[in-house]
């Protein structure tokens, strides 16, 4: 059984502590893929949920003073339960508040994968970095940032951009699938965090090949969505992306994946 078949067979529970803007899209995307999202945010039920969950996604897009302690509590409970965590430090370089929170979170919680654009990942290892928001700086050296971040933070790193870079231990892989229309819909990167979590299967030390598959399945679905005859802009692309995630299979993944080890 390949990983995509396993995902659909097991229908893994993925707890999504994600931002308010993208909850609906993230949930629908994971359902289309074959996972079972739970948008649970209460620390009081975190022990029960993380015990059953395949993974926990934490996305700080709408971080507030009111929820920051809950995020850390839930992360610590997931650690106690042995549940892998995907961490998405959205716009961490945009404010000192976000930088300080991420520094604290990563100091108190062990994460399995950190996903972000080059600017966000750079900020995690160089807190003097500034950025205007969630946008990535295309001139940054994503390969070296990923390598340094993986070593410094001792976790798997996924950097998104025109090409995606995955770094784990001393191995680095560049992926070249995707669609420019992903940048025209809100929550595309946030959904990718959920897709990564769906592929973890309670594994806190996933292989880099598993991470490659998760990212590539999503990006290949985006390519196919862009190419659909009726897609003529962001709105039709968004709905078609859900359909392509639903239709994705292992043969298509293996035939279409564009990857190279660096």
From Swiss-Prot:
Pathway note: Cofactor biosynthesis; thiamine diphosphate biosynthesis; 4-methyl-5-(2-phosphoethyl)-thiazole from 5-(2-hydroxyethyl)-4-methylthiazole: step 1/1
Organism listed in the record: Staphylococcus epidermidis (strain ATCC 12228 / FDA PCI 1200)
The protein's name: Hydroxyethylthiazole kinase
EC number: 2.7.1.50
Gene3D superfamilies named among the record's database cross-references: 3.40.1190.20
InterPro entries linked to this entry: Hyethyz_kinase, Ribokinase-like
Catalytic reactions on record: 5-(2-hydroxyethyl)-4-methylthiazole + ATP = 4-methyl-5-(2-phosphooxyethyl)-thiazole + ADP + H(+)
Record keywords, A-Z: ATP-binding, Kinase, Magnesium, Metal-binding, Nucleotide-binding, Thiamine biosynthesis, Transferase
Superkingdom as given in the UniProt entry: Bacteria
List of residues binding substrate: 39, 187
Binding annotation for ATP: 115, 160
